[in-house]
Amino acid sequence: MFCRKYVFQTWKQLSRSYSTVNSIGAAKTRNIGIIAHIDAGKTTTTERMIYYSGRTKRIGNVDEGDTVTDYLPSERERGITIQSAAITLPWNQHKINIIDTPGHADFTFEVIRSLRVLDGAVTILDAVAGVEAQTEKVWKQASALNLPKVVYVNKMDRPGAGFSRTVQEVIQKLETRVVLCNLPYFETNKESDLEFKGVIDVIHQKLLKWNETDANGNEISVVNIDETTPDLLQILEKSRESMVETLGEYDERIIDSFLEHDENYLKIPPMLLDQVIRKATIDNYLTPVFCGASFRNIGVQPLMDGITKYLPSPLETSLPQITKNGKDVTKKVDGEKGLVVANDNNLTLALAFKVMTHSTRGPMTFVRVYSGKLNAASNLINTRTGKKLLIRKLLVMHGDSPEEVKSISAGNIGVIPGYETDFQTGDTLVSSAVAKRNFTAKDSAYRLLPIDIPPPLFNAAIEPHTAGDEAYMKQCVETLIREDPSLKVHLDKEMGQVVLSGMGELHLDIVRERLVNDMKAKVNLKDVVVSYKESFVGKREKEAVITNEEIEVAVTLSHIEDARDYVGQEGALVIEEDNNVILLSETASSEHVRATIDERRWKCENNLEELKEAILNGCLTALQMGGPILGFPLHSTLVTVNRWNVPVEVAQEQALNLMNASRQAVQSLKDEKKDFSILEPIMSTKVYVDSNDLGEVSHDLTQRCKAMIVEIQDQSTQNLETAAWAKDEAAKVYVPPDYTIKKNVSKFDDIANKKIIVAETPLREMIGYLSKLRALTRGRATFDMTLIGMRRAVGNRVDSIVEEYKF
């Protein structure tokens, strides 16, 4: 046995100069996200990575509020991640761009927009809780983007930690093959309890044991596992056999090596194992698994090794979807330049995936450069606006600390500072790697796949203290919306209030805190309420005709079930967020308008497309102005423009008149309340409870929360109704027994004794549910919700909603 500083700490000096790190090529760059359920240890793990890379001289602590990545006052006060933070680290002659994402369901959009620009992900699991609800949700989001992943089983030092159980859940719940790159190592303490001390490196056949006297986790004892350590050797042999069997089914080189080495699993070279694991990970064939206890500084360095060894570089990841004028463009990967688009080595394409306003540095736009090189002191075009901008400076962020750089090359993440109103989340930016280039309209035709924005579910009204405070309040709200596109705003004209709409209670609480505490806006804050809708449910279609001098618009209102049925239909504007459709066919224009076009007598100051857009905008405005019951926005409604006419042979502007007429036509159809109903959001709710609490929680759901229980599932891995493949795969993987569970059985609740209550619940009844659930179960239960859709409220439900919105 010998003791030394961990070998990769010798590379720490490189981190002192970002210019050195920035010179690292795409092949040795890793863009990764840290994803997990809340409280799994994402930020704690990230802070250790920052320290071990040499970026900081001390380890940031969530409890002490001095973390690098959680730097917002609200984050440090609450001890949770709210905004995704970006940081660049050097490690093992590689560059790792890390984004530490939120774990709370209210900030799912932060996760979504971060995943879009990443090449891989580290999924952190709590070894006591196992695979939790938000983990499953984010895993599916990452899988939909074909992101390769590694798993890190954290908190192995906690009573009740179950590595074996957690691995089985990974296979069955996340439906992935695994290879266990390291295993937990325990020693018995004076109280005869097992304590987590280190990890068994299955690939290199070593025991890594962290020195308890070193508070920062730098000193690690490395022990060869051989005949002198028979117990460890037995575990290693079984683990190696399981690893080789899994890898052998993927790559024949493993089988060949096994036969060449006298069918000895331990003699297969680590280098070959690493190569095959890397290839299989990038192909999403399997997931490497690591373990540790980040708070005690155990296991983080091997995880960082795994990131550089197994996750892909920008040269190896799935190519982004890029279009030009709606058509796919050619893409190829150059070993030196990275992604080359449209056979143009100098074409630079970047995606603005996040916009924020810093308290002292002002506006900051986070970008992922996909092709070419984004240079400081160069021009770019925002393809959404067509506007040409001079980029003066570029930054790379380390949590809350920026470093100015001369360029951001393909495959990297950086920041454009300044430009308060010029960028929005999802913008495609076009530039050139060469200094001088004349941009044309063709350059504005490029589009990277936009970022989907989920619909908001909760509302909260705000009012300025005085009329003099209104302008600054609106300015602050506009800033928040640019930063967070999942936050919506509309004006309640009747009440004179600005209404914010967000993803959840916590989401809106944080927004309101930022308005008052960070931005110093003088506003009154109202309670968070559910976002309801209204829908036309009349038995017949209703038609209205608005005639104003020579302008005429005729529209019909009807109910629809699924707006997606109209996607691709000619003349259909589909608003998926509200399940609405506006149908404007080519034949809707009057014979007079069509004849004017054919005879070339058109004198109107607006062209045909501008007039059509005016009609659509007028109809859309009317839908958003709400229904006749309580003024909620309309939902599941089809507006059909049957005909329209304007005097296009007259030389004057008609778009505004046509838009107003369209709005009035739709508004006139909302005169009778009996033709409309209130829709409320219905959630698919999963409540995770101990068997002992099942009855009381179920009763509370059905009686107080007005829930309809769909089924009750067993949460233990032995009874999960998963695919036969996942069960077979779990049976093939060797994991050592969870001795910690057996030894400490009296110190924690049996996790295998948990149930899942699956129910459909009105969202309104789930406000504040977490605190009530914890009170019922003494803090042992959790829950997760996803939106099923909007459902018609009937009977007493309507009365309670109307009562809620009386002012």
Swiss-Prot record:
Kindly list the cysteine pairs connected by disulfide bridges: none
Per UniProt, the keywords (alphabetical) are: GTP-binding, Mitochondrion, Nucleotide-binding, Protein biosynthesis, Transit peptide
Q: Which domain of life is it from?
A: Eukaryota
- InterPro entries assigned: EF-G-like_DII (IPR053905), EFG2 (IPR030851), EFG_II (IPR041095), EFG_III (IPR009022), EFG_III/V (IPR035647), EFG_V (IPR035649), EFG_V-like (IPR000640), G_TR_CS (IPR031157)
Q: Where found in the cell?
A: Mitochondrion
In this chain, GTP is annotated as bound at 36-43, 100-104, 154-157
Question: Which residues does UniProt assign to the signal peptide?
Answer: none
One biological process term from GO is: mitochondrial translation
Which Gene Ontology terms of cellular component type are present?
A: mitochondrion
Q: Does the keyword Lipoprotein apply?
A: no
The UniProt entry, under Pfam families, shows: EF-G_D2, EFG_C, EFG_III, GTP_EFTU
CDD domains found in the cross-reference section: EF-G, EFG_III, EFG_mtEFG_C, mtEFG2_II_like
Define the transit peptide region by residue numbers: 1-18
Question: tr-type G domain: which residues?
Answer: 27-315
Any idea which GO molecular function terms this record carries?
GTP binding; GTPase activity
Q: Which SUPFAM superfamilies match?
A: EF-G C-terminal domain-like, P-loop containing nucleoside triphosphate hydrolases, Translation proteins
Is Mitochondrion included in the keywords of this UniProt record? yes
Note the SMART domains from the entry.
EFG_C
Q: Which family does it belong to?
A: Belongs to the TRAFAC class translation factor GTPase superfamily. Classic translation factor GTPase family. EF-G/EF-2 subfamily.
Query: What is this protein's function?
Result: Mitochondrial GTPase that mediates the disassembly of ribosomes from messenger RNA at the termination of mitochondrial protein biosynthesis. Not involved in the GTP-dependent ribosomal translocation step during translation elongation.
The name this protein goes by in its record: Ribosome-releasing factor 2, mitochondrial
Species for this entry: Candida albicans (strain SC5314 / ATCC MYA-2876)
